[in-house]
Amino acid sequence: MSTSMSVARSLPGGPVAEQILAEVAQEVTQLRAAGVTPALATVLVGDDDASVGYIRIKQRQAVQLGFASPHVRLPASASQADLQAVVTQLSADTSVHGVLVQHPVPPHLDFDRAMQALDPEKDVDGMHPVNLGRLALGLPGPTPCTPAGIEALLAYHEVPVAGREVVVLGRGATLGRPLAMVLAQKRPTANAAVTVVHTGVPDWPRYTRRAEIVVAAAGVPGLVRPEHLRPGAVVVNGGVRYAGRRLLPDVDESCATVAGAMTPRVGGVGPTTVAMLFRNAVRAARRTRSSRTPVRLPDSGAPAGR
């Protein structure tokens, strides 16, 4: 007698990203026709392989979309004053509409202090304290890219979120905490009952086992296994680590035998994060055109479903 094992439905991020980037490209075309070339400046400190790779991806995408893409690279030995001087200069440059400081920075530097030197209107990562405060209050503003991308991914694949129990496993400033705020917003693509738990809680699986949606955001490879999940749960693999160029996700691939739907190891959340970066950037450029009627792209971070 043979038995078959169910496999979770895949939730790829590629189609979501393509839809968002098509909207961005249309807006870039309109801005350029009005005499504005959107410019996204990137800042990299040091030579971390993963960070260099990320910057190359973003610069390549910027060129494809029609953005100008100035880049500043500082040595790993750069001081806090060096980094903040660059950020301040880019903030004051009227030809630059968005600024991305690639994270992580070398350990002797304070990323948060550098972000405070940035004009909040040019914060395409959504990580300036002013913009995080706006998110907490439910006010419009740049949303952190990975949380916004996760909301969009779930909406595109028609995964119901409103009223469901969501557990975010991880409390980091770039994903776990802002994602909890995003998914608790009062709108159809969010409005969830969100619990944030982390590896400092000895019995964290007690929370994930009851969740209808689990978002892994801990940055601990292989942390989430099938026994940590409720059968049929939706699983989003947001947390990753790199060993050289090898991607090590939080969610073990064997979870696909228990989950009802799951993002793939490669091509899941990553593409939507990049797409949201450019959506934030084009909106920053659009805000400089105060005299023109804005194109009304949705502010929720969630494109329409399929």
From Swiss-Prot:
UniProt-listed Enzyme Commission number(s): 1.5.1.5, 3.5.4.9
GO cellular component, one term: cytosol
Enzymatic reactions: (6R)-5,10-methylene-5,6,7,8-tetrahydrofolate + NADP(+) = (6R)-5,10-methenyltetrahydrofolate + NADPH; (6R)-5,10-methenyltetrahydrofolate + H2O = (6R)-10-formyltetrahydrofolate + H(+)
Family: Belongs to the tetrahydrofolate dehydrogenase/cyclohydrolase family.
Entry keyword annotation includes Hydrolase: yes
A Pfam family matched in the record: THF_DHG_CYH_C
Protein name: Bifunctional protein FolD 1
This protein's UniProt keywords: Amino-acid biosynthesis, Histidine biosynthesis, Hydrolase, Methionine biosynthesis, Multifunctional enzyme, NADP, One-carbon metabolism, Oxidoreductase, Purine biosynthesis
Residues noted as binding NADP(+) in the record, renumbered to the chain: 170-172, 199, 240
Pathway where it operates: One-carbon metabolism; tetrahydrofolate interconversion
Function (record text): Catalyzes the oxidation of 5,10-methylenetetrahydrofolate to 5,10-methenyltetrahydrofolate and then the hydrolysis of 5,10-methenyltetrahydrofolate to 10-formyltetrahydrofolate.
Gene3D superfamilies membership: Leucine Dehydrogenase, chain A, domain 1, NAD(P)-binding Rossmann-like Domain
CDD domains for the chain: NAD_bind_m-THF_DH_Cyclohyd
Cited InterPro entries: Aminoacid_DH-like_N_sf, NAD(P)-bd_dom_sf, THF_DH/CycHdrlase, THF_DH/CycHdrlase_cat_dom, THF_DH/CycHdrlase_NAD-bd_dom
GO BP annotations listed: L-histidine biosynthetic process; methionine biosynthetic process; purine nucleotide biosynthetic process; tetrahydrofolate interconversion
An example Gene Ontology molecular-function term: methylenetetrahydrofolate dehydrogenase (NADP+) activity
Quaternary data: Homodimer.
Annotated stretches, region: Disordered: 285-306
